[in-house]
Regions:
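Rhodanese-like catalytic fold shared by cysteine-dependent sulfurtransferases
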Residues: 1-20, 30-74, 81-123
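Structural scaffold elements adjacent to functional motifs in cytosolic proteins
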Residues: 24-26
Length: 123
């Protein structure tokens, strides 16, 4: 089939996503959320374990926030590596059609002085 395509998103694209109802998902681990904070409006769903395996609860949690395969989804991680791989899998293997990822991750977001919220473990 065709190579999976996911859209490379900029900080500005994410700001738009916050306003237009796009589902924003932070796929990092809880210790990373605590370290950097999180972007306002993001769903927190860990995609990979520390050793890089797919997190056992990811698919169930992910599917619980998605209404259908056309749902606009924007993923972010630390620097864009994990979301690039995950996004391609969502398109290729699960048939999602509207997936983008924050190319520079939260690292690039914070470099540009964009706001984050603190993460509380109770979330």
């Amino acid at each position: 089939g065709l190579a999976a395509k996911i859209t490379e998103a900029s900080n500005q694209d994410l700001q738009e996503a916050q306003k237009n109802g796009t589902l924003i998902i932070d796929i990092r681990r809880p210790e990373e959320w605590a370290q950097t904070g999180i972007i306002e409006g993001a769903e927190l769903i860990t995609a990979f374990t520390k050793s890089g395996q797919l997190h056992p609860e990811f698919q169930q949690k992910f599917m619980s926030v998605i209404t259908d395969r056309e749902t606009p989804i924007m993923l972010y991680c630390r620097t864009g590596n994990r979301t690039s791989n995950l996004g391609k899998a969502l398109v290729d293997q699960l048939g999602f059609s509207n997936v983008s990822h924050l190319s520079q991750g939260i690292t690039g977001w914070q470099k540009a002085q964009q706001p984050v919220q603190s993460y509380k473990a109770s979330q």
